[in-house]
Regions:
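Expand to "…catalyze enediolate/carbanion chemistry for C-C bond making/breaking, isomerization
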Residues: 1-276
Length: 276
């Protein structure tokens, strides 16, 4: 059974207290950050702590590590550390991905699968090619802060303002069976804004979201988990078409609506999202 990334909590690897709290949270996955959340002079300290945390928690908790970019001076040490704990590490988050080749290289170095942060204009332009990286790539995440800076627009996501980019990433991911995760809402004390942004990407079809504070976890899990009524409706659609097939029909009426294979595909996706 696949465990969904509905609510992914990102925490700086340099702060042991926050990391321990994250490990005990309700997040579906913890991302230990070695990149933007860590000052240059503390990269070695963060890398050492990340190794400890993965060794301690990784066999019972799904953990990913966001490393520094392949062309930075910290990348070799980051990748070496990830390789040393790869048996307990779920995946590596790679920033500013702009090609499938970098995904394959880093996956080989780290001995793990890769989650790709798409956060540059070139990354968006190359998104379809990025998704041809094969089994090394398991998810895409939109990084609004860096992408906004690269595009010259505000970093805060405002629903439809990002719609073309969100759809481009979603279509590319779906075409290669890659999870698509929304980037974090950057204002912490703003549950209404958080919910508005995340309900929008849930409506678009995203699988989940990054969060930057434990207080956002419950809302994220609720938004990206189908309700009991939605789950029941999906089961009824599947059962109705199964009955139609038994009768030799390609489509059947349910509650005054025609049910065919297209609706069953959507129903199965709802059941998959709600299946823990």
């Amino acid at each position: 059974m696949v465990k969904r990334r509905r609510a992914v909590l990102v925490t700086p690897a340099v702060d042991r207290r926050k990391a321990d709290l994250a490990m005990r949270s309700t997040a579906d996955e913890i991302v230990l950050d070695l990149e933007d959340g860590v000052a240059p002079e503390r990269k070695d300290e963060a890398r050492s702590l990340a190794r400890e945390l993965v060794s301690e928690y990784g066999h019972s908790r799904r953990i990913a590590i966001r490393i520094n970019g392949e062309n930075t001076r910290w990348a070799d040490d980051d990748m070496g550390m990830c390789a040393s704990v790869s048996s307990a590490l779920d995946s590596v988050v790679l920033p500013k991905v702009e090609s499938p080749e970098v995904i394959v290289r880093v996956a080989d170095r780290c001995g793990t699968q890769i989650q790709a942060l798409v956060e540059t204009a070139r990354g968006i332009r190359e998104i379809n090619r990025i998704c041809t990286a094969g089994p090394a790539l398991i998810s895409l995440i939109i990084g609004y802060a860096d992408l906004g800076a690269d595009l010259g627009r505000p970093a805060l996501p405002h629903g439809r303002d990002w719609h073309p980019i969100q759809d481009a990433v979603l279509v590319a991911g779906r075409s290669e069976n890659v999870e698509v995760i929304d980037g974090p809402h950057l204002t912490i004390a703003d549950d209404a804004g958080f919910r508005k942004a995340k309900e929008w990407t849930d409506l678009l079809g995203f699988d989940g979201t990054w969060v930057i504070h434990p207080g956002q976890l419950d809302s994220a899990r609720e938004i990206y988990t189908p309700s009991p009524d939605e789950m029941d409706g999906a089961r009824r659609v599947i059962d109705a078409l199964d009955l139609g097939h038994e009768r030799g029909q390609g489509a059947i009426s349910l509650d005054g609506k025609m049910v065919d294979e297209a609706l069953v595909v959507a129903a199965r996706r709802i059941l998959d999202k709600g299946d823990e």
